[in-house]
Structures are given as C-alpha cells and as structure tokens.
C-alpha cells in the first residue's frame, strides 16, 4: 500500500485525525477528533485532480447530488465537534456531512458529486457556522456589512435608525416601526429579527407588537424596568412564545437585583450584559448568572478584561445613554456601572460556562464587527491565566474550551431566541450559513461567508486583475448579496405574525420564519455553558465569589488577534 507522510497529507488534503492546529496567533490548540474520509478516496478539485467526469464526479441528475460541496473542511462547531469532512449543500441547506465523490466507482460515498455540483475547496480551512449577534441596536444599516464581513450571519435586536431611543435601547416600538423595519430587512444579506418595546404595565401594547412581527420584547431601564413591567412582559411572552431580553435597573430605583429576580417568577429571560458595565443593577447584577431560568450574555467592550477596559467605558457610557458630564448625578450613574472587579470575574465566569452567550451591543457600547474576535481573545486570556480546563487536562489540546466558546455566539443565542431549528450549528437540515477561515486568520478575517448556500461576501482582490488574488484584497459583497438572491437570507418573526394579514399585506420578499420554543429554554439547555454557580458580590469592595471561590484575574496588557492583523 502506498504511504504518505502526515505533513504531505495535511498540505494536500488538510489535517486529519490526531493532527493539531493553532487558532490564529492565540495559545488555543485544536486537535482533529474524526475524519469522515476514506484514505486514498479523498475528493479534491483542480487540474489533474479527483473531481473530474468519470472519476470523482458521477452522472447523477441534480436531484441526487449536492448543489455545492465543500471538500475536506475542518469543522469547528459546538454540536458537530471538531471533525474533518466533506459538506454537501442543497437547496440552501446543509444536506449532508460525510464523504463526497462518485458512488459509481468509490466506496463509502454519502455526498454524490455530479455535473450540477459546484466545489468550494476546504482543504486546510476551518469551517464554522455563521455567528449570531443577539444584541443589535439598529442604528445604521452599515452595521450589517461590518457584521457580515466578520462572520456574523444573523442579527437580532431593536431600533429604527439613529433615533435617540435606538441609541440607548434595542427596541423597535409599535406596529408602524416594526413593519417598516421588516420591509427594510428585505434589502440585506443577513438573517434579521426585531425586538419590540417591552416596557408597559398592561398586555395590550405588547401583544400588538408581537402580532406585528417582533421575535421578542426588550425591557430596558431607560424606559422603566419596574417589577410590574417585568411581570407583564413575561406574561405576554409566555402566552405568545417569544423571548424577553432585559437591561435591568442600574440605579436600583424600583428594587434591587433580588427584586428583579423575584419578578421573573422562574420564567425564562435573556439578561443582557449580565456583568453590569453595559447596564444593570449596580453592583451585583452578575448574581443573575446563577439562576436556572436566566440565560446570561455579555457585550463585547468588557471582553476580555484588559488594561484599557475601564478607561474607555466612561465616555462610551455618557454618549450612549444621553448623559450630561456637567451633571454630577449623571456622572455618578456612569461610574457606578464600571467596576474592574466584576469585569475580571466575567472573564472567569465565561471560562467556567456560567456566562452562556456573547454579543455586541452595536454602536451603543459595543462593536458590531468584533463579537468573534472578542470571544476568542477571552478564551486565549483564560488559557494563559488559568491553564487547561478540567475537560481538556492531559489531552494536549483545547477542544472542549473551543467548543464552549464557539457555542457562545452560535448555538446558544439560537436556542435562546427560538431559531435553533434553522441556524446556529453545522447540522444537516439547517440553513447553510457557513464561514470558511484560514487557520492563521481564524476569528479575525474570514475568507468566505455563505448565506443560505450562496457566497454572500468574501475577501477579494482587484476586480481588474488577471487572477482573483492581487492587492488590494478587501471584503466585498458577492452575488448572494444582490437582487433576488437575498432570499438566501430569512427574516425571523413571531408565530402570531405569520397568521397576521397585516404582515402578509407587506408582501415581503425574504422568507419569514417563526421563532419557536422560546419559553421552555433553561440555563441547562445552553450548550457547554450551563453552569449555575451561587454568586456573591461584596457591596463595598465589589469582590465576586462563585460558590465561595474568589474570582480574581489580572487585566491583559497584550492580546492576540490584534495589531498583528490590522494596520489601521
């Protein structure tokens, strides 16, 4: 039998079982857990290679073959694991994960390739599910380009543009605004969903927003997040199967964190920026991560804790929440939210799986294009400061930690907001929202972004060059971002909206997909991130303990995935 060295094999077909890779310039190491290929029967496209007529390409009709095959890709996914496989796409969905080729002459083929199949070379590349950012202020549409080019393919949030209310809160208030935003969503290669304003003491104003098309309701302290508003909002959400997101009462005007937790009455809720710098009961909203019904997320400015984190937050907060630096009370409000002790604890609670999700808080104390980067910078910092997780101990890799962190911006926000039946992981039947990365650029600069099976964006060279690669190489929209191909993206709505004639009358062009199962989600359902430690915060020193253990870590003075990759 012919043999080949591991190095030569990896250079030709990508890494295989037992091979290890470094993610970008971090200290995170992945190891391939499984390879679906049959050695000697790999498929690869190119001159003199396998995918040619009568060889790796068979004679089947379109109904029997993949529309697209991504060959020899290394999947990194919270659900699928860290596995090497061919991935077949069909009708905009992930059709099969397995072994591609020509079943007429090759053994073990699960993804037939034919004349109707396009090929994307995944050799030496990492394939992830498109990211999900569940904390979007819809301040400007240009955010969508930034998010897409960073590897995010689903954006959930609220707002109407650069209105003062949207600068501060993720709410698209009332049926008129909701319908206009649903119409605007048709123009973008992005899955989108909208939150209505959840601050009301009677159910009527909330129900009409859900019927108009929002996928959830947002309670925000700037609109008055009182116990009565919380209770009313959750009651409507339970009735109509939508999620509730909350930014709690920083000033503790209508109660303390215990008051808010009591108002939940054990019902499911997504707590935004649960550390508190982004807003919430000062100084101890972080206690919420210990509740079985609370699904906690972070926003990315505090991720990870660095020597610059505290300094940048004060001015950011003053602008975003319409505060006046000349008013002492406004300054005191801002300063109460920025605490180095709880930000440091947030790092550790992410690493232990107590914080379940990562998000941006786009243009409103968060950077929309940095959800992915900040997630992996946090993972790197924790690897350096805390060493291997118990689940990875002695294995020589960081596979479990990597699955834990990628879940924070893929499957967990999908589960939380009732869209995991469509997006959030690399599983057969889900929308083919996929991102290809060179390992050296993982988490920083993707190579290709697919939406619904079609390339929507890519790092592309000079369009007038004789080949695709000459400088300037920068991110450009591809054909999936134009015309009726925008139907490769979806707009998420409530179940009530699908039955609403007023929504049908909008004649929206992108497919509408209803959220489902939002009210039965528990912290235990958060993949690799379901820990519920008992949290204590000292009201004087802000020191945080989890199950009695002191949570302390130093700020980072240097990070990977930073200036090495960006000139400007």
UniProtKB/Swiss-Prot annotation:
Its cofactor is Ni cation. It comes from the Bacteria. Binds 2 nickel ions per subunit. Residues 130-568 form the Urease domain. GO terms for cellular component: cytoplasm. The modification N6-carboxylysine is found at residue 218. It is an enzyme of class 3 (hydrolase). Pathway: Nitrogen metabolism; urea degradation; CO(2) and NH(3) from urea (urease route): step 1/1. It is found in: Cytoplasm. Carboxylation allows a single lysine to coordinate two nickel ions. Pfam families: Amidohydro_1, Urease_alpha. Substrate binds at residue 220. GO terms for molecular function: nickel cation binding; urease activity. It catalyses: urea + 2 H2O + H(+) = hydrogencarbonate + 2 NH4(+). Coiled coil: none annotated. Keywords: Cytoplasm, Hydrolase, Metal-binding, Nickel. The active site is at residue 321. Ni(2+) 1 binds at residues 135, 137, 218, 361. NCBIfam families: PRK13207.1 (NF009686), urease_alph (TIGR01792). Belongs to the metallo-dependent hydrolases superfamily. Urease alpha subunit family. This is Urease subunit alpha. The gene is ureC.
């Amino acid at each position: 039998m012919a043999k080949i060295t591991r190095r030569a094999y990896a250079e030709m077909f990508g890494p295989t079982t037992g091979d290890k890779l470094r993610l970008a310039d971090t200290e995170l190491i992945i190891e391939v857990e499984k390879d679906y290929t049959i050695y000697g029967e790999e498929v690869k496209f190119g001159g003199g290679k396998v995918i040619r007529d009568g060889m790796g390409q068979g004679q089947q009709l379109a109904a029997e073959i993949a529309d697209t095959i991504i060959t020899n890709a290394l999947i990194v996914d919270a659900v699928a694991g860290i596995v090497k496989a061919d991935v077949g796409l069909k009708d905009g969905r992930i059709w099969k994960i397995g072994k591609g080729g020509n079943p007429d002459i090759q053994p073990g083929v699960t993804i037939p390739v034919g004349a109707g199949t396009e090929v994307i070379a995944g050799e030496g590349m990492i394939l992830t599910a498109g990211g999900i950012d569940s904390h979007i202020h819809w301040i400007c549409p240009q955010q969508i380009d930034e998010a897409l080019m960073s590897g995010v393919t689903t954006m959930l949030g609220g707002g109407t543009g650069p209105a003062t209310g949207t600068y501060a809160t993720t709410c698209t208030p009332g049926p008129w605004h909701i319908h206009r935003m649903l119409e605007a969503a048709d123009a973008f290669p992005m899955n989108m969903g909208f939150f209505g304003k959840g601050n009301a003491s009677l159910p009527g104003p909330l129900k009409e927003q859900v019927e108009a098309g929002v996928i959830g309701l947002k309670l925000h302290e700037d609109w008055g997040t009182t116990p009565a508003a919380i209770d009313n909002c959750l009651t409507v959400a339970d009735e109509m199967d939508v999620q509730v997101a909350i930014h709690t009462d920083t000033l503790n005007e209508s109660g303390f964190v215990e008051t808010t937790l009591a108002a939940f009455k054990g019902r499911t809720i997504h707590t935004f920026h649960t550390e508190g710098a982004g807003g919430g009961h000062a100084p101890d909203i972080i206690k919420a991560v210990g509740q079985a019904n609370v699904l906690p997320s972070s926003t990315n400015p505090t991720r990870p804790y660095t020597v610059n984190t505290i300094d940048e937050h004060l001015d950011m907060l003053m602008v975003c929440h319409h505060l006046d630096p000349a008013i002492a009370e406004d300054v005191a409000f801002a300063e109460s939210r920025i605490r180095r002790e709880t930000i440091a604890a947030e790092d550790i609670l992410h690493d232990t799986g107590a914080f379940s999700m990562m998000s941006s808080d786009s243009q409103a104390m968060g950077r929309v294009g940095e959800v992915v980067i900040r997630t992996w910078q946090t993972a790197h910092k924790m690897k350096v400061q805390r060493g291997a997780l118990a689940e990875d101990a002695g294995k020589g890799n960081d596979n479990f930690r990597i699955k834990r962190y990628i879940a924070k911006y893929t499957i967990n926000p999908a589960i939380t907001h009732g869209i995991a039946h469509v997006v959030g992981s690399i599983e057969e039947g889900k929308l083919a929202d996929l991102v290809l990365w060179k390992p050296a650029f993982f988490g920083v600069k993707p190579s290709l972004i697919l939406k619904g099976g079609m390339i929507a964006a890519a790092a592309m060279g000079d369009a007038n060059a004789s080949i695709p690669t000459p400088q300037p190489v920068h991110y450009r929209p591809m054909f999936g971002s134009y015309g009726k191909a925008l139907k490769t993206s979806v707009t998420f709505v409530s179940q009530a909206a699908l039955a609403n004639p007023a929504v049908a009358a909008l004649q929206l062009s992108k497919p509408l997909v209803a959220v489902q199962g939002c009210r039965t989600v528990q912290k235990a359902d958060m993949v690799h991130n379901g820990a519920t430690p008992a949290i204590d915060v000292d009201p004087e020193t802000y020191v945080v303990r989890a199950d009695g253990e002191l949570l302390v870590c130093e700020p980072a003075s240097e990070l990977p995935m930073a200036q090495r990759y960006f000139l400007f």
